[in-house]
Every structure is written in structure tokens, then in C-alpha cells.
Amino acid sequence: MSGHRSTRKRCGDSHPESPVGFGHMSTTGCILNKLFQLPTPPLSRHQLKRLEEHRYQSAGRSLLEPLMQGYWEWLVGRVPSWIAPNLITIIGLSINICTTILLVFYCPTATEQAPLWAYIACACGLFIYQSLDAIDGKQARRTNSSSPLGELFDHGCDSLSTVFVVLGTCIAVQLGTNPDWMFFCCFAGTFMFYCAHWQTYVSGTLRFGIIDVTEVQIFIIIMHLLAVIGGPPFWQSMIPVLNIQMKLFPALCTVAGTIFSCTNYFRVIFTGGVGKNGSTIAGTSVLSPFLHIGSVITLAVMIYKKSAVQLFEKHPCLYILTFGFVSAKITNKLVVAHMTKSEMHLHDTAFIGPALLFLDQYFNSFIDEYIVLWIALVFSFFDLIRYCVSVCNQIASHLHIHVFRIKTSTAHSNHH
């Protein structure tokens, strides 16, 4: 079964590609399914075939992972066996996003002071996401429901969470008063996540460093709690020896982390891939993925610096979310390319949102840049969701599984 057949089913028929795996769809459900599903399946038959052969490979462990394993094992033991791993992941992501949106609501320019409970909620939301994200794979193995879809879903949620986590951190330390630093921190976060999967696309193995996601998440949780304890005076206070504001300390940590991580990533990338003649796992150039993330960052910098109305300075959260959704989509496409051993194509609807902003500036802001930013934000979010829903549904249909439900017997079982 290639996954192509079920996209032609009539509304009301049994629909194996339904995101939640329900058998019967109402008229409203059918309309939503068409709205959030691409007209043609995103993956070819050859890609689906190679996806079946994919096996998850990882190497290394971070500093806190051995210490957290006991807690994670205890936590997964409390989860009912009928709860699907992907459901655990999406619940954690939803909580993480909702708590960050609270901060965005109260601090749209990342310079305001939010209610103390909003910072506590954001810290708790991130801890919940970190916990649930860590146990989804354990739940998959525990219920014998591991699949390539689970791995893709996990990385896809992480790509979106990264955007909200770095944005929430910038808001917590009120980094909007230093727009250049805020811009750097947010894009450095998404760039590092992309590079992690870039080196996986090259080497075939996802590598974890001594300081990795878990450590960064714990550090960010501490930042939110410090915002509760110290408030604005704490972040505005000066660090004695360095003679800089305290709020720049997380930014300097981001610089150090970016240098450290990217050094390791590019060492793997430039060493050569596992493909023919040192190419990627798909047999393509090891440098080819740079075109995608490079295009996103270049457009983001140009639009930021050329704006006549200080678009980023006045609306940093909307700006970061817009380009964050674009980055999340191309990261997801990179993960799919790795798992299906296929080439990444540069032409993508993800670039339409940034292109609208660029063209509007080129024609001397024929339309208010703020309005175009909202259009780009909505389009980029819709484009991301549409792609993710389509890919997940097609893979679920092909593997004869459900996205958010565990089947009694699982036909395909890989490492999650």
C-alpha cells in the first residue's frame, strides 16, 4: 500500500489517514481534512519503501541523562499502556506552546513584565514537555508500537518546541531591549537544531553531546524561575567583572553553546558522509542542506535590517514565530529526507511568507509591513501544519497504524 489510494476516498468513507485514526468522518471533518491535507501525497512510493527500511541510530549521552533516567523510567511506569506515544508527545508540545503564548500575550515586544504566575507556568510547561518528550520512546517500546512515524513525529514536535522555547526565554529575560541579541539567540537555537539533523542526514546517526537538549531545557527553566524571584531589577543589574547587564548572560551562553555545538556538527559534516564518495545518506552533497537554512536566515536578516518601520524591534515575537514556523518546516523536511534517503529540494512553499515580506519592502512597503507580517505568520503556520498532517497521515496509512492510537498488533516495529 503506497499511501496514495486513500487520499481519493469520499467523505464519510473509512479513512485510514485520519490523524486520530477514526473510521467515520463527518462533513465538517472531511472539510478540515481537505483543508489541512496537501492535494497530492508528499512522499513517493520509493520514499515510503525506504522509510520502511529505516532504523533509528544514535550515539552519545548528555551529562544529565543518566541522572534523569530513573525519573523517566518511574514516569513511564505511571502511564497507561493504551496511551499512544505520539499522544504523549503532542500533549507535552501543546502545554509547552500554550504556556509560551501566555508570555507572548503579556510581553509582545519582550520588554514588558508578565505576571509572576506566567513565568511559573512557562517553567512548568517546559518541564512537562521535557518529561513527556523523554518517555514517548520508552512508551513505544513498552507497548511494542515503535515505528518510523514515531521518530518523525518526535523530531517534528521538537522542531516546533525549539521555536517557542527560545522565544519564551528571550521574553523571560526581557531581551527585547537588545533586539540584535534577541535576533541572534532565537535564530541560533533553530540553526543548531537544524544542524543536529543536518549531520544526521550526512552520517546516518543522531549524535548527542555532553551538553545537549536536556541540559539546555533545565537551564531555561532556571531562567524562568529567576524571572519570578528577581524580576526586572535582576535582569537589569550589572555583572561586576564583565560589566554587562545580567540579561546578556543567557545570550553569551548561547554564543558559547553555538560555537561548541556547531564545531562538533561541522566536524562530522566535513569529515564526509556514509553515502557514495563521502556524500549524504541520500547520495547528495553534504553541503546541500545549507541552502535551505541559509536562505531562511538571510531573508530574516535582510528584512530585519531593511525595515523602514522597525518591524522586528516593534513586533519581535510575531517575527520570530513567522520565521520559526518556516525553519520548523524545512527541518521536518530534512528529517524526512534522512529517513527516506531522498534529496531535499530548495523550491518550497515555506519561503512564500518571507518572500511576501521581502517583496513588500522591495516595493517600498506598498502594504503596511505589520499587516504583511501577520499574513506571513498565518501562511507559514498553515503551510507547516498542512505538510506535517499530510506526511503523518500518509505514513500512518502506509504502515497500517494510527497516529494517536495504538493498534492491538503492530505490523512494523523499529526503534523509536
Curated annotation (Swiss-Prot):
Q: Which GO terms describe its cellular component?
A: endoplasmic reticulum membrane; Golgi apparatus; nuclear membrane
> Which residues act catalytically here?
155 (proton acceptor)
Q: Where does CDP-choline bind?
A: 86, 151
Residues marked Increases basicity of active site His (site): 151
Q: What Enzyme Commission number(s) apply to this enzyme?
A: 2.7.8.1, 2.7.8.2, 2.7.8.22
Binding locations of Mg(2+) 1: 133, 154
Residues bearing attached sugar chains per UniProt: 144
> What does the UniProt record say this protein does?
Catalyzes both phosphatidylcholine and phosphatidylethanolamine biosynthesis from CDP-choline and CDP-ethanolamine, respectively. Involved in protein-dependent process of phospholipid transport to distribute phosphatidyl choline to the lumenal surface. Has a higher cholinephosphotransferase activity than ethanolaminephosphotransferase activity.
Quote the protein name from its UniProt record: Choline/ethanolaminephosphotransferase 1
Report the source organism: Rattus norvegicus
Q: Which gene encodes it?
A: Cept1
